[in-house]
Curated annotation (Swiss-Prot):
Topology relative to the membrane: Multi-pass membrane protein
Lineage of the species this protein comes from: Eukaryota, Metazoa, Chordata, Craniata, Vertebrata
Protein's name according to its UniProt entry: Prestin
Recorded name of the encoding gene: slc26a5
Entry-listed glycosylation sites: N161, N164
Enzymatic reactions: oxalate(in) + chloride(out) = oxalate(out) + chloride(in); sulfate(out) + chloride(in) = sulfate(in) + chloride(out)
PROSITE patterns membership: SLC26A, STAS
Amino acid sequence: MEHVTVSEEPSATLMYHVERPIFSEAYIDSELLHKRKKTPKPYKLRVAEHLCCSSEKVKSVVFGFLPILTWLPSYPLKEYLFGDIVSGISTGVMQLPQGLAYAMLAAVPPVFGLYSSFYPVLLYTFFGTSKHISIGTFAVISLMIGGVAVREAPDSMFMVNGTNSSLVVNIEARDSRRVEVVVALTTLVGIIQFVLGLLRFGFLAIYLTEPLVRGFTTAAAVHVSVSQLKYLLGVKTARFNGPLSVVYSLDAVLRNIADTNIVTLIIGLGCTVFLYIIKQLNERFKKKLLIPIPGEIIVVIVSTGISYGMLMSENYGVDVVGKIPTGLLPPKVPDFSVFPNLFADAVPIAVVGFSITISLAKTFALKYGYSVDGNQELIALGLCNFVSSFFHTFVVTASMSRSLVQESTGGHTEIAGLLASLLVLLVVVAIGFVFQPLPTTVLAAIIMVNLLGMFKQTRDIPVLWRKSKIELAIWLVSFFASVLLGLDYGLAVAMAFAILTVIYRTQRPKNVVLGQIPDTGLYFDVDEYEEAEECSGIKIFQSNSSIYFANSELYVKALKAKTGIDPEKLLDAKKLQLKYAKRDTEGTKTVNQGSLLKKNAVVLLDMELGVTHEVLNGPQKPKHVHTNGQMTEKHIESESEDEFFLQRLTPIHSVILDFTPVNFIDSVGAKTIKSVIKEYATVDVKVVLAGCSRTLLSELRTLQFFSEPVTPDLIFPTIHDAVLQCKRWRDLPVHPNIH
């Protein structure tokens, strides 16, 4: 019976009172709960329903595959069109220089960055579910691609005799081969992402936890910055890939720093300072500016004009972008023969690209109150990369900087991205050749300034130090592994370490003994809360973890340590007591056998566990004490030898295992708990379980946990039920206020 009582005073606490019997799972299953009867459908009927092709199912599949059909028919022109136009132009203006710059990171000619800023963006408009992210080139992915291209097509493969009988690199042949490798890699990444999307593997992103991703992208920023130093200084060095590539690249730049082109350095530093100032102004006055100041396109146009007018390439030796063909290249089938060499690289690129996209998409979706589908995003990215690869593009993902511009300038839908791609198309078709005199140091400046946001992620370190040491460890391992081992190996190490931290958490959970708050049915950690009082003769143990093969033994060790009850040690002590008692009765003592037995009681001091177990109660006389394996004689009393050895070895008669935090248990864990129940029974301590969820109980039944000596009578829905029943078993009085 249950009723609620509310005091008439305004500040009164709402009270409730429940009167019911003590419930065990045996009673609940037999009397209280009855499962709903469900008639399983025949297998043929289930197959027929699954294969049934109704109009609603077709519509759902089509609309799910082409999300544009869900929002375009109801597109509000008056409210959204102007904002999407402004946003599209702003994003497109930003996408042009970034496409050129990130192509350098991908180790392909700049024009392929423009192709990658058009085709995938156009496709995402039809297949994507996010309204605000900007798909296209991105520094991290471009760098990973470039590493593969340089490995598969190094300069050493394209050495030819120069004019002075010296060996020089055939740039045209090298770039052509690198484009083939990058395009094939993009095709493979697209296939992987598309297949994962069809298999509903959108949940993969959860394994790339935020500290891991932020540490990884910060490390990528270090790699990118180091790779751009040679362009900023105008020195000629080889491109390094793999473990310690950052160290080798820095060493190469420093060895050749005497060859720095001063004009190149001045242009690069000037553009860097200008872009940094513009970035700060845009951030400071973003609420007052209709659109951000397009600093990147300004430096591109101005530096291109100056370079063209002053013939910087010919007169000052400044490296420039070079030939940019006008128009679009015809489609071409990728080179499938290199797939076996690229598969190991394609998997991490596919996963990282998707992780960046879905994290940005979810951020904007949460802000504006709509939902994104992770599986559809995988399909959309896969199609963007796969289809576009036939048109000479490299792998794309969402860009944080462009997405922020697209959102802040009033973008409402994917129409903004569509307009941005059309602006890129206009440049490629009509005026791409204009950017041929553009100094590469300007592109390096654009890249490095855009990395500032990633470097700011180092601010996570003090925050994580205060919040979570384990997450800080993930961040640091991800960062240093990626910096030193390279992005591919670094990501693998970081993911492995993140998984190990999950195992570590389950193996090192918080283990506590619970006590009751007086006059309530609430139980809390006795070490943390002074109001919590242990129940006489009962230990309540809670471990904040599930129980499975990796931590089952640790669970038992923690149980024995926290409760102070080790059945094996208690039984050994009992055997020692018997041995010494027999020796004393057979030896020549000043007291006879009868008087010794009358005065025997035992206190076992288990110094190893740091607790005292009273083995027998009674007036203390000469007795035996077991301390760290040594026996000493003291005085106690007892009635007879039989009574002496039948007394309890510990004042604790019951142990309650709180299973409230346990989400799952495997066969090893179930066997472990069952052995604990049997082991404690040998020293007359009853072990019961409390707080098991219905799912956990179902798992225990499946694992055949309920067989002698374990029965459902030992399982209770709450700790309070278990405490009351344990007291009843020992015929102890139950306080009336805690019924």
